[in-house]
């Protein structure tokens, strides 16, 4: 893959793993994979999407031992979806054990487009929007975060998502439905990005 795609300008990072369990054999294999990646392409940084953190109350410490081998740490953080309630997320604080740049490689929640209800009712657009709202507050508080990639733009087919009447073999975490209809969370994320862009523009104007 690296040999095929290393001249593509769209490739920013090489990711060598996604949510791998923490044990010695994994650390040995992945560290060798990082070395091979750098041998094949010395011009790009190497990352991995991790989901191992130690927890101390509302504090999450990024201390996966494999994080010492990569250049940029990716974190898959599904607060409010795979753990906790949406309003827990804004109270979470994060620490990075080794000071490396961090990207939130996945975050989000599922919703069936057109399904409405209370903000605490799973699979509704309101619940997905609440997860995004509180996660975006959490991200604002993570000063060492250098980027995010919400999971995911559009619903897609998934044979592992059989829940009848809701999933029907689709992954429903998209900000858009499978037919491209925007869900409520899409507008929240757009406003977040617009706010970030305006803030950056103001910083640039100060430097000028």
Predicted regions and their residues:
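Substrate-binding/catalytic cleft of secreted carbohydrate-active enzymes
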Residues: 1-195, 202-208
């Amino acid at each position: 893959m690296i040999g095929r795609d290393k001249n593509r300008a769209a490739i920013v990072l090489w990711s060598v793993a996604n949510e791998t369990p923490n044990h010695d054999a994994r650390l040995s294999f992945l560290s060798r994979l990082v070395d091979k990646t750098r041998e094949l392409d010395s011009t790009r940084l190497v990352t991995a999407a991790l989901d191992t953190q130690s927890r101390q109350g509302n504090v999450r410490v990024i201390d996966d031992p494999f994080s010492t081998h990569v250049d940029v740490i990716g974190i898959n953080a599904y607060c409010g979806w795979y753990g906790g309630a949406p309003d827990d997320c804004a109270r979470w604080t994060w620490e990075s054990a080794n000071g490396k740049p961090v990207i939130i490689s996945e975050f989000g929640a599922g919703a069936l487009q057109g399904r409405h209800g209370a903000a605490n009712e799973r699979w509704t657009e309101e619940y997905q929007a609440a997860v995004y709202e509180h996660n975006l507050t959490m991200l604002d508080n993570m000063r060492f975060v250098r980027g995010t990639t919400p999971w995911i733009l559009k619903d897609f087919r998934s044979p592992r998502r059989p829940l009848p009447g809701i999933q029907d073999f689709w992954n429903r975490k998209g900000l858009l439905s499978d037919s491209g209809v925007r869900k409520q969370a899409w507008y929240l994320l757009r406003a977040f990005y617009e706010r970030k862009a305006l803030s950056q523009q103001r910083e640039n104007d100060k430097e000028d």
